[in-house]
Design a protein with these regions (language model features):
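Cysteine-nucleophile amide-bond enzymes
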Residues: 1-204
Protein backbone atom coordinates (compact mmCIF):
# COMPACT_ATOMS: atom_id res chain seq x y z
CA UNK A 1 0.00 0.00 0.00
CA UNK A 2 1.36 3.40 -0.97
CA UNK A 3 1.58 6.13 1.63
CA UNK A 4 -0.16 9.35 0.54
CA UNK A 5 2.47 12.06 0.79
CA UNK A 6 0.98 14.61 -1.57
CA UNK A 7 1.97 17.46 0.76
CA UNK A 8 5.52 18.71 1.10
CA UNK A 9 7.81 15.76 1.88
CA UNK A 10 9.98 17.31 4.53
CA UNK A 11 9.97 14.91 7.48
CA UNK A 12 11.59 11.57 8.22
CA UNK A 13 10.70 8.78 10.62
CA UNK A 14 12.84 5.76 11.35
CA UNK A 15 11.87 2.19 12.08
CA UNK A 16 14.38 -0.12 13.71
CA UNK A 17 13.85 -3.85 13.36
CA UNK A 18 16.22 -5.97 15.37
CA UNK A 19 17.15 -9.38 16.69
CA UNK A 20 18.73 -9.85 20.08
CA UNK A 21 19.87 -13.15 21.53
CA UNK A 22 17.38 -13.20 24.41
CA UNK A 23 15.18 -16.24 24.97
CA UNK A 24 11.93 -14.37 24.07
CA UNK A 25 13.50 -13.11 20.82
CA UNK A 26 14.58 -16.61 19.91
CA UNK A 27 11.09 -17.96 20.61
CA UNK A 28 9.47 -15.25 18.47
CA UNK A 29 11.94 -15.89 15.68
CA UNK A 30 11.21 -19.63 15.87
CA UNK A 31 7.45 -19.05 15.73
CA UNK A 32 7.48 -16.50 12.91
CA UNK A 33 10.31 -18.06 10.87
CA UNK A 34 11.53 -14.53 10.15
CA UNK A 35 14.95 -12.95 10.78
CA UNK A 36 13.88 -10.11 13.11
CA UNK A 37 11.87 -10.24 16.32
CA UNK A 38 11.52 -6.62 17.47
CA UNK A 39 10.40 -3.26 16.05
CA UNK A 40 10.80 0.30 17.32
CA UNK A 41 9.94 3.75 16.00
CA UNK A 42 12.39 6.67 16.18
CA UNK A 43 12.08 10.37 15.48
CA UNK A 44 15.69 10.95 14.50
CA UNK A 45 18.39 9.36 12.37
CA UNK A 46 20.65 8.61 15.34
CA UNK A 47 17.84 6.73 17.13
CA UNK A 48 18.18 8.92 20.21
CA UNK A 49 14.42 9.32 20.64
CA UNK A 50 12.98 5.87 20.12
CA UNK A 51 9.92 4.03 21.43
CA UNK A 52 8.55 0.52 21.53
CA UNK A 53 6.82 -2.13 23.65
CA UNK A 54 9.26 -4.45 25.38
CA UNK A 55 10.60 -5.45 28.79
CA UNK A 56 11.08 -2.54 31.20
CA UNK A 57 14.21 -4.01 32.76
CA UNK A 58 16.96 -6.35 31.70
CA UNK A 59 16.19 -9.39 33.80
CA UNK A 60 12.40 -9.83 33.86
CA UNK A 61 10.98 -10.65 30.40
CA UNK A 62 7.41 -10.54 31.74
CA UNK A 63 7.51 -6.98 33.09
CA UNK A 64 6.77 -5.37 29.73
CA UNK A 65 5.01 -2.33 28.39
CA UNK A 66 5.57 1.01 26.69
CA UNK A 67 9.23 2.01 26.90
CA UNK A 68 11.65 4.66 25.72
CA UNK A 69 14.53 2.75 24.16
CA UNK A 70 18.25 3.48 24.03
CA UNK A 71 20.56 1.50 21.79
CA UNK A 72 23.41 1.89 24.30
CA UNK A 73 21.62 0.61 27.42
CA UNK A 74 19.14 -2.07 28.48
CA UNK A 75 18.91 -5.21 26.38
CA UNK A 76 20.51 -3.47 23.40
CA UNK A 77 23.44 -2.37 25.51
CA UNK A 78 23.91 -5.81 27.01
CA UNK A 79 23.61 -7.78 23.78
CA UNK A 80 26.48 -6.45 21.69
CA UNK A 81 25.67 -8.89 18.89
CA UNK A 82 22.22 -7.44 18.23
CA UNK A 83 21.65 -7.34 14.47
CA UNK A 84 19.32 -4.80 12.91
CA UNK A 85 17.93 -3.00 9.90
CA UNK A 86 17.24 0.74 10.06
CA UNK A 87 14.47 1.94 7.76
CA UNK A 88 13.74 5.52 6.71
CA UNK A 89 10.19 6.65 6.00
CA UNK A 90 9.32 9.97 4.37
CA UNK A 91 6.16 11.61 5.71
CA UNK A 92 4.44 14.97 5.52
CA UNK A 93 4.77 17.56 8.24
CA UNK A 94 1.13 16.95 9.19
CA UNK A 95 1.69 13.21 9.52
CA UNK A 96 4.83 13.80 11.56
CA UNK A 97 2.96 16.06 13.97
CA UNK A 98 0.28 13.39 14.36
CA UNK A 99 2.99 10.87 15.27
CA UNK A 100 4.27 13.27 17.94
CA UNK A 101 0.75 13.55 19.35
CA UNK A 102 0.31 9.77 19.40
CA UNK A 103 3.61 9.26 21.19
CA UNK A 104 2.81 12.02 23.67
CA UNK A 105 -0.41 10.20 24.56
CA UNK A 106 1.50 6.97 25.16
CA UNK A 107 4.04 8.77 27.35
CA UNK A 108 1.35 10.53 29.37
CA UNK A 109 -0.42 7.24 30.10
CA UNK A 110 2.55 4.88 30.17
CA UNK A 111 1.40 3.11 33.35
CA UNK A 112 -1.81 1.96 31.66
CA UNK A 113 -0.10 -0.01 28.92
CA UNK A 114 0.75 -3.69 28.98
CA UNK A 115 2.44 -6.04 26.57
CA UNK A 116 0.06 -7.94 24.30
CA UNK A 117 1.36 -11.48 24.84
CA UNK A 118 -1.89 -12.97 23.52
CA UNK A 119 -1.47 -10.84 20.43
CA UNK A 120 1.73 -12.70 19.55
CA UNK A 121 -0.23 -15.94 19.63
CA UNK A 122 -2.79 -14.29 17.34
CA UNK A 123 -0.09 -13.40 14.81
CA UNK A 124 0.95 -17.04 14.65
CA UNK A 125 -2.68 -18.07 14.10
CA UNK A 126 -3.25 -15.18 11.65
CA UNK A 127 -6.05 -13.88 13.85
CA UNK A 128 -5.56 -10.43 15.35
CA UNK A 129 -6.05 -10.24 19.10
CA UNK A 130 -6.28 -6.55 19.91
CA UNK A 131 -7.04 -5.30 23.41
CA UNK A 132 -7.21 -1.75 24.72
CA UNK A 133 -3.91 -0.60 26.23
CA UNK A 134 -2.19 -3.81 25.10
CA UNK A 135 0.40 -3.89 22.32
CA UNK A 136 3.32 -5.91 21.13
CA UNK A 137 6.20 -4.07 19.49
CA UNK A 138 5.30 -4.19 15.80
CA UNK A 139 1.60 -3.71 16.58
CA UNK A 140 2.52 -0.53 18.45
CA UNK A 141 4.61 0.87 15.60
CA UNK A 142 1.96 0.00 13.02
CA UNK A 143 -0.80 1.54 15.18
CA UNK A 144 1.08 4.81 15.64
CA UNK A 145 1.64 5.07 11.90
CA UNK A 146 -1.91 4.14 10.95
CA UNK A 147 -3.51 6.55 13.42
CA UNK A 148 -1.25 9.28 12.05
CA UNK A 149 -2.51 8.74 8.50
CA UNK A 150 0.60 6.87 7.38
CA UNK A 151 -0.60 3.78 5.52
CA UNK A 152 2.32 1.64 4.41
CA UNK A 153 1.05 -1.86 5.18
CA UNK A 154 -1.88 -3.94 3.99
CA UNK A 155 -2.39 -5.60 7.38
CA UNK A 156 -4.25 -4.53 10.49
CA UNK A 157 -1.78 -3.61 13.26
CA UNK A 158 -2.57 -6.72 15.28
CA UNK A 159 -1.13 -8.92 12.52
CA UNK A 160 1.99 -6.92 11.70
CA UNK A 161 5.37 -8.60 12.17
CA UNK A 162 8.66 -6.67 12.42
CA UNK A 163 9.85 -7.83 9.00
CA UNK A 164 6.67 -6.49 7.34
CA UNK A 165 8.09 -2.98 7.66
CA UNK A 166 11.23 -3.96 5.76
CA UNK A 167 9.10 -5.40 2.95
CA UNK A 168 7.08 -2.21 2.51
CA UNK A 169 7.70 -0.29 -0.73
CA UNK A 170 7.44 2.97 1.23
CA UNK A 171 10.60 2.57 3.27
CA UNK A 172 14.27 2.93 2.43
CA UNK A 173 16.88 0.68 4.02
CA UNK A 174 19.67 2.92 5.28
CA UNK A 175 21.60 0.42 7.38
CA UNK A 176 21.91 -3.31 7.94
CA UNK A 177 24.35 -4.78 10.41
CA UNK A 178 25.27 -4.75 14.09
CA UNK A 179 23.32 -2.20 16.09
CA UNK A 180 26.38 -1.21 18.13
CA UNK A 181 28.08 -0.06 14.93
CA UNK A 182 25.19 2.01 13.63
CA UNK A 183 26.22 5.45 14.89
CA UNK A 184 29.80 4.78 13.87
CA UNK A 185 28.47 4.02 10.40
CA UNK A 186 26.58 7.33 10.31
CA UNK A 187 29.68 9.27 11.31
CA UNK A 188 31.87 7.45 8.80
CA UNK A 189 29.29 7.83 6.06
CA UNK A 190 29.08 11.59 6.57
CA UNK A 191 32.87 11.90 6.72
CA UNK A 192 33.44 9.86 3.57
CA UNK A 193 30.70 11.66 1.64
CA UNK A 194 32.33 14.98 2.52
CA UNK A 195 35.30 13.80 0.47
CA UNK A 196 33.19 12.38 -2.34
CA UNK A 197 33.70 8.74 -1.38
CA UNK A 198 31.47 5.80 -0.60
CA UNK A 199 30.99 3.53 2.39
CA UNK A 200 29.15 0.22 2.45
CA UNK A 201 25.88 -0.10 4.34
CA UNK A 202 26.71 -3.61 5.49
CA UNK A 203 28.63 -3.51 8.76
CA UNK A 204 28.89 -7.10 9.83
Amino acid sequence: MKNDISELENRKLYILISKTHTVPARIIKFWTKEPYAHASIALDLELREMYSFARKGIYNPFNCGFIIEDIDTGIFGRDVETSCVVLELTVTDKQYRHVLQELAAFKANADLYRYNFWGLYGVIRNKAIERKYNYFCSQFVASVLERSGIHILDKQPGLVRPDDFRKSSNVKVIYKGLLRRYREYLWTHDLVQAFGGHVTKQAM
